[in-house]
Every structure is written in C-alpha cells, then in structure tokens.
C-alpha cells in the first residue's frame, strides 16, 4: 500500500506526537527504510517507457527555444555621459582618510580594467548583427545600429578608424594616447597639461632590452620620435614639441599597448600635416639601430629599419569604393520599390561616416568582430525599451576559455546576520553600472562588435545575390537588393531615423571602451568596484550600513531623518566620483528591505512575494504520476531551491529531484511526495539572524554511542547498530538540541558544522534539518570536547567546561572595512583591562 502523506509526516517526526527522539531518529538512518520509502513514493523508478513531459506551467527545458518577440516600437534607452574620475583613490582619501589595502587593490583593478584572453576568434562582419528576427531583419538591423551609435556617442564604445587608430566621444583618460593630426599627444600621469610630441608613427611600444646608455638614446625612437643626431637636426625644421624633463620613463612605459610585429599608425591625416620625414631621412634615422633586433611583446623580432612607407599602406588599407547608398541617386529606378526612390527623398544625406572627438592609437585591430549583437526587451516589466545583448561567449567556451575570477556572493545566513536589524532602508539605483568601469584600449581588439553595412546584410538575407568583395558596388548588382519588403521597411524607418539611414547603412567596427556585459570578467569587476565604494562609505558614515551586491546598493540608518541626510551626503559623494545614480529609481523600504530576492526585516529574512507566487503557480501546474523531463526538473529545483532554507526540511527534501537530474532521467511526482513538498512550501519560516552567545552544550559521538554535556549535566546512550561516524555525530547534535533547547551547540564534526544535511540518508536529513533549524554550531577540537568521554561510555571523568564564545559570521560578503556597530541607546559599561591580563604572559 502506498505511503500516505500523513504517515510520511509522522515518519519524518514533523508531528508532535512522535515517541522519544533517541529511539525514533536512529531508525531514519536505516538504509532499508530509506529504500522502502523511496519505492513507496515511486522515487527510485527512473526507467520509464511513457513519453516525458517537457513543459510544466511556464517552465520548459533548460535549453528551450523561448522565442523572443521583436517590438518595432522599441525605444533605445539614453545613456548619460558616464566618466568615472580617474583619481578616484585620491578623492576617496580626501573624503575618508587613507584607504585600506583591500579598497585600494579593488579600485586599482578597475582603473583601467584589463582583459587578457588566451585566444580570440575573429568572425566576419556579416555575423556582427545576429539575424535573430528573420521577419524584421531590416528593422532589427537599424535599431541595433542605432543602439550601437548611441553607445558610441555616450563614450562607451571606440570606433575603429584604421587598423591602429580609433576614435571616441567623451572625456579621455590618461592611458588613452591621443593622436592629433597623426601625432601622438602624451598626457603625463599628473595631467598638468598635454605634452604634444611629434610622432613618427613607429607603432612599437615594447620594453627595450638594452643597457641604459642605448636605452636613453632609444627612448625617443621607441615613442616614434627622431633620435637626436646631427644629420636629423637639419632635416626637422619646424617640428613641434620636445621631450620635457617632466615626463618620467615610467609614464612613457605605462601605455601598455604592445602591437605584435612592426607597423605604424595609419592616421588618416595627410602626410604633410603629420610631419613625417622623407624616407631617405628615415633611413639615416634608423641606420644606427639596424644592428639591434628589438623584441616586441609577442616575441617577433622586429627590424627597425624595415618599416613600411606611409603611402603604400594607406592605399592598401582603404579601397576607394563609391558609397552604396548614394549610388542609387544616379541610377534609373528598377521598379516601384527601388531604393532610388528613398535616396532621392533627401538632397543632403549627411556624411558617410562620423568621427569621434578624440583619436587614439590602439593595438592592431582587424576589420572583424569577435561577438554578435541583437536586441531584446529591457526586462520583463519594461518592454517599451530595448536592451543590447552581446554574445562574447567564445571567451567562456572551448579549449581556450578564460577562467573568470571567483568572487564572494553573500549567502542567506550572512546576509541576514548583516542586514536584519531595526534600521530604515533605501536602495540606490546605479544607472548603467557596467558602463562605469573603463577598459584599457589594449583590450579593444578582443571585444569587437559591428556590422557589415546594409548592402551586405540584405544580400546575405536574400541569398540570391552573392556579393564578393571585388564586385562590391558595381552597378549590375546594385539593384539586386531592391525588394518590396526592404522598400517598405526603409520607408517606415525613414520616419524614425531620417538622414541617419545613410550613416547606418555603412559598415562599422566598434570596440568596447567600458566593460561589456557579455564577458565573465565584468560581474567580477563590478562586484569589486561597488564593494570597495561601499566600504569607503561605511567608514565615512560610521553609524550607518552601506552594502552592495553588483549594482544594487542599499543604505540603512537608525531613523528616517538620519537616512534622508545620509542619502543626500552619499549621493553627493558618489556623484563627485563620477558615479551616475538614477534618482527616480531610489526606493525607500521602511524597515523591511527588499534585496537580492529576499525581504529582510528585524525578524529575519523571507523570499519576496513574487517568488512565493511563482512557487504556488508551479505546484498548481505540477502533474502527478507523469514523467517530467529532467531539464524541466532543473528549472523547478532552481525555483524551490531558492526558498528551501525557509521550509521545515530545507534542501534535503529536494534530494530525490537532484538525484534524477544527476542521472539525467525523468522524474515522476507521486501524490504523497507532491503533497509533502506542497505543504513544505506553503508554510515558510523566516531565517533569523544569529546572535552572539556562549556555547554551554556539547555533543559528541562514536559509531556505537553518543554523549552530551549540558552545563554540569552529562548524558550518554548507545546505538542499536554501529553507524557511520558523520551520521552518529548528526544524531548526537539532534539529541543535544531537543534535550537542552539551546541554540548554540559545540561539536567536533565538520560535516555537522557546515549544516549540509544533503549527504546523509534522505529521511534523516529531512528530520535533522527541522530539529536543528536555527541552531548555530561552534567547533570544539576533539581533545577539548567535554562530551568526548560520555560518548565513549565514561561518565566519571570531568573535563573542565570550556567558555566558547559564538560570533555570527558575515562570511566574505564584501565587508572589507567593517562599519562600527550602531550604538544602542544605553552606553556599554567601560571595561578596564586589568594590568595582570595585559602584562603577564604565560612562560
């Protein structure tokens, strides 16, 4: 007869009328019983012949094709001009005094951030914008291009101008080497004023491996300046700039852009204005160097007198193609839907390309992309605005994947210990948090996005015309792309974008200037950044709590008035660092803080209501006695696992589901198991904060017996059959809790200490979780454990009781500078250390 739910509850000792714990609990560790219950609940039956169910409510398989919906009305969000101050460390120090080592290290990490992949795969430009919405291809193309353009205008992207130069908008940082009229302009690290140098575009910035005497001669040539020799001095009349003594070699070396192989910047300015010497003079300039070979960072030996001449390079770089868009103006319309009708709507279509306010030199960047982009809804609640998804998954896959750094994510207990209090809370919204953190230009060649231009994009979609590079723009295939669909789409888009259609129809390659969201490095850097900032804020305002996880920053203070003044001060401080806050999205929570999916109040933490709703919905739609695909089970476990700490039996209750996912088998919910889970999740108990205290109850066990010490009372008992040591220790802890009612227990077993009950027999894990809920454990070394003797059957020997203080931990939750505790209303009594305690040291 199948096990009824009532009987199952009784078995797990969840009801009060169970017999004495010492008899009942060890039975749950019995393998035979666990197996019989599993069979009764149909948990072990993994080989099913009925077809699997692949959808439960909203949950589909993990790699489900949930088709994103294209919205033709999408607005591109606006981005403020975000410029994080470069001297952020100094500004923080002015505000709060010297920073701790931790804070400094974290802030240096992001100023600028660097990215070193092992290998970068370059994809053709056609793959730049993903054909994610085949029905709305053209519309999606222009919306995505507009989004990229917006990011470039906001200073978040670089635009690749040539192989070795890029332009951007916004304020430059000192590590971005400016080119003006083809010259390098060096900003010194102190930023007193710009030093402008005349560059001879040698493009080699590797560390020079010579002795000091040659090195001083070379210093200028390494930066592309002429070595000062008699023969040259005559040749360089009227050249601007000279090296002043103020530029230290360290600042010159710190532009860590190290191109592999020789090359130079093709600077797009005419060669007269870039004050290049004649090649004859250049040969003399380098003749004294030709004996050396200089090693560049990638290990190629570079001969310095071998530089390609400027003119030949620029011709090979820029094929002279007429503009595809403007060509339609002079051609005869091929039909009613010819693009020439649209092109003739305007006299002035504006320039073919736009250039940024600043030009900088970059490492060699090919005309390729390294990741595709597409648009989706900004979030489930905001479908009016779009969000750009960048797929840089190549860096986290395959043999050359980058192993991203790990960082601490606060767990539930740490979070509750830290934030569960009677403070008033508000949360700040950092707008476009990722785009605050600047990336070094050396990362640009690895993080490229872009598009191949409208003509290629359309041709690729309508696959009847293959465009090869050499036919590009010839008249016979100019009209191949004309079609009714394209005509109608462009006519509608003309209303939105006007003459920008021309600009957006050109190919473009953009690299990231701020960290992109699609790379595993970014969340790590963001977490380091916000936690360091919060650490500074906590020290600046001792009686408040500031805490952050990623871009979610919360502030807590004793009273609402205190909180408001704190809010003003912190906002001004963050703005002075260049951090952009979104004032409309500041939320005031009162005494119960909503953070990371939890509601945290003085009683402890609970899941937010929308998660509880989702769980109810999930149980409503959960089919009984039907095999459910294990990928759907993954989704269900993800949802239930989040709320598991708030239930009686916790994670152990989900163990059968975990087992089926691990074996990649379908799972069948029996009515009893479903009713059990349902009941578990209908009554949620808050996770309370742990309080400091003294440990006075100790438990210990051997495979055959257990022992407890409660104050001066001692107890011992034996097991019917020998048990594995971890199981015995867990039973001893349960007995100690139920006998003494104490919520701080001393144990010498690391598995019990970790409160992970998922490795024990299933029924025992579930029961123990409920008995030990809210218990804190203190580690006692076996040699000092007072319960060691009773567990071995010796009640006569007394070990002195230890005074073991328990201090709740906040884990590694980014509290680098611990904020002083909020003062209670009564001042503590002053404690004078006795001179004996201080002065006397044991021999």
From Swiss-Prot:
Protein name per UniProt: Protein P
Taxonomic lineage from the root: Viruses, Riboviria, Pararnavirae, Artverviricota, Revtraviricetes
Region annotated Polymerase/reverse transcriptase domain (RT), chain positions: 347-690
Activity regulation as described: Activated by host HSP70 and HSP40 in vitro to be able to bind the epsilon loop of the pgRNA. Because deletion of the RNase H region renders the protein partly chaperone-independent, the chaperones may be needed indirectly to relieve occlusion of the RNA-binding site by this domain. Inhibited by several reverse-transcriptase inhibitors: Lamivudine, Adefovir and Entecavir.
Site (Priming of reverse-transcription by covalently linking the first nucleotide of the (-)DNA): 63
GO molecular function: DNA binding; DNA-directed DNA polymerase activity; metal ion binding; RNA-directed DNA polymerase activity; RNA-DNA hybrid ribonuclease activity
Organism the protein comes from: Hepatitis B virus genotype C subtype ayw (isolate China/Tibet127/2002)
Physiological role: Multifunctional enzyme that converts the viral RNA genome into dsDNA in viral cytoplasmic capsids. This enzyme displays a DNA polymerase activity that can copy either DNA or RNA templates, and a ribonuclease H (RNase H) activity that cleaves the RNA strand of RNA-DNA heteroduplexes in a partially processive 3'- to 5'-endonucleasic mode. Neo-synthesized pregenomic RNA (pgRNA) are encapsidated together with the P protein, and reverse-transcribed inside the nucleocapsid.
Region (Terminal protein domain (TP)): 1-177
Gene3D superfamilies named in the record: 3.30.70.270
Domain notes: Terminal protein domain (TP) is hepadnavirus-specific. Spacer domain is highly variable and separates the TP and RT domains. Polymerase/reverse-transcriptase domain (RT) and ribonuclease H domain (RH) are similar to retrovirus reverse transcriptase/RNase H. The polymerase/reverse transcriptase (RT) and ribonuclease H (RH) domains are structured in five subdomains: finger, palm, thumb, connection and RNase H. Within the palm subdomain, the 'primer grip' region is thought to be involved in the positioning of the primer terminus for accommodating the incoming nucleotide. The RH domain stabilizes the association of RT with primer-template.
Gene designation per UniProt: P
Matching PROSITE patterns: RT_POL (PS50878)
Other comment: Hepadnaviral virions contain probably just one P protein molecule per particle.
């Amino acid at each position: 007869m199948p096990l009824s739910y009532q009987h199952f509850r009784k078995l797990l000792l969840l009801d009060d009328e169970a017999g004495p714990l010492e008899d009942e609990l060890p039975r749950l560790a019995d393998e035979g019983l666990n197996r019989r219950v599993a069979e009764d609940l149909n948990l072990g039956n993994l080989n099913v012949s009925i077809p699997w169910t692949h959808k439960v409510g909203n949950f589909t398989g993990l790699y489900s094709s949930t088709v994103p919906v294209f919205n033709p009305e999408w607005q591109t969000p606006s981005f403020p001009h975000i410029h994080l101050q470069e001297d952020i460390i100094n500004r923080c120090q002015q505000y709060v005094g010297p920073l701790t080592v931790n804070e400094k290290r974290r802030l240096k990490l992001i100023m600028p951030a660097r990215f070193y992949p092992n290998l970068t795969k370059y994809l053709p430009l056609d793959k730049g914008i993903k054909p994610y919405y085949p029905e709305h291809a053209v519309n999606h193309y222009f919306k995505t291009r507009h989004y990229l353009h917006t990011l470039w205008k906001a200073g978040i992207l670089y635009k690749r101008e040539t192989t070795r130069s890029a332009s951007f908008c916004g304020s430059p940082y000192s590590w971005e080497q400016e080119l003006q009229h083809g010259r390098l302009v060096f900003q010194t690290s102190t930023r007193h004023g710009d030093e402008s140098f005349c560059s001879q575009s040698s493009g080699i910035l590797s560390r020079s491996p010579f002795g000091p005497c040659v090195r001083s001669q070379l210093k200028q040539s390494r930066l592309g300046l002429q070595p000062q020799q008699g023969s040259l001095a005559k040749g360089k009349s009227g050249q601007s700039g000279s090296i002043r003594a103020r530029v230290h070699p360290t600042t010159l070396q710190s532009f860590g852009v190290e191109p592999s192989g020789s090359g130079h910047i093709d600077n797009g300015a005419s060669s007269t204005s870039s004050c290049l010497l004649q090649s004859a003079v250049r040969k003399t300039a380098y003749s004294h160097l030709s004996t050396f070979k200089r090693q560049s960072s990638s290990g190629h030996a570079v001969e310095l007198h071998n530089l390609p001449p400027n003119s030949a390079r620029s011709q090979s770089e820029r094929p002279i193609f007429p503009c595809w868009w403007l060509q339609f103006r002079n051609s005869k319309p091929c039909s009613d839907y010819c693009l020439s009708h649209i092109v003739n709507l305007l006299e002035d279509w504006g320039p073919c390309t736009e250039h940024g306010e600043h030009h900088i030199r970059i490492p060699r960047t090919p005309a390729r992309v390294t990741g595709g982009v597409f648009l989706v809804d900004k979030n489930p609640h905001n479908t009016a605005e779009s969000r750009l998804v960048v797929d840089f998954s190549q860096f986290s896959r395959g043999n050359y994947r980058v192993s991203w750094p790990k960082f601490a994510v606060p767990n539930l207990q740490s979070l509750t210990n830290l934030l569960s209090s009677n403070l008033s809370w508000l949360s700040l919204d950092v707008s476009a948090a990722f785009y605050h953190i600047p990336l070094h230009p050396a990362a640009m060649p690895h993080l490229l996005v872009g598009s191949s231009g409208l003509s290629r994009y359309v041709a690729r979609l309508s696959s009847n015309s293959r465009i090869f590079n050499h036919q590009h723009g010839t008249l016979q295939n100019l009209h191949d792309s004309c079609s009714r669909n394209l005509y109608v789409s462009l006519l509608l888009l003309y209303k939105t974008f006007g003459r920008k259609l021309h600009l957006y129809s050109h190919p473009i390659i953009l690299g990231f200037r701020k960290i992109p969201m699609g790379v595993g490095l970014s969340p790590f850097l963001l977490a380091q950044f916000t936690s360091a900032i919060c650490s500074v804020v906590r020290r600046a305002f001792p009686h408040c709590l500031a805490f952050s996880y990623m871009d979610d920053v919360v502030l807590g203070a004793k009273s609402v008035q205190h909180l408001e003044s704190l809010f003003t001060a912190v906002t001004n401080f963050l703005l002075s660092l260049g951090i952009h806050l979104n004032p409309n999205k500041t939320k005031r929570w009162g005494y119960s803080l909503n953070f990371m999916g939890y509601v945290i109040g003085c009683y402890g933490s609970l899941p937010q209501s929308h998660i509880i709703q989702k769980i109810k919905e999930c149980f409503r739609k959960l089919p009984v006695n039907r095999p459910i695909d294990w990928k759907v089970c993954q989704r269900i476990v993800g949802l239930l696992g989040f709320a598991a700490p708030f239930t009686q039996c916790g994670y152990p209750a989900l163990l059968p589901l975990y087992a089926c996912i691990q074996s990649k088998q379908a799972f069948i919910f029996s009515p009893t198991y479903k009713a059990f889970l349902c009941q578990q999740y209908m009554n949620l108990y808050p996770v309370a904060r742990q309080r400091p205290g003294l440990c006075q109850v100790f438990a210990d066990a051997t495979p055959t017996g257990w022992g407890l010490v409660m104050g001066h009372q001692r107890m011992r008992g034996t097991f019917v059959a020998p048990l594995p040591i971890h199981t015995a220790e867990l039973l001893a802890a349960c007995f100690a809790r139920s006998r003494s009612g104490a919520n701080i227990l001393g144990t010498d077993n690391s598995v019990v200490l970790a409160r992970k009950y998922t490795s024990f027999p299933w029924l025992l894990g579930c029961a123990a979780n409920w008995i030990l809920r809210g218990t804190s454990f203190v580690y006692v070394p076996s040699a000092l454990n007072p319960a060691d003797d009773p567990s071995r059957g010796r009640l006569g020997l007394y070990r002195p009781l230890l005074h073991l203080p328990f201090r709740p931990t906040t884990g590694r939750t980014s509290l680098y500078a611990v904020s002083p505790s909020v003062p209670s209303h009564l001042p503590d009594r002053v404690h004078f250390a006795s001179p004996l305690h201080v002065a006397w040291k044991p021999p």
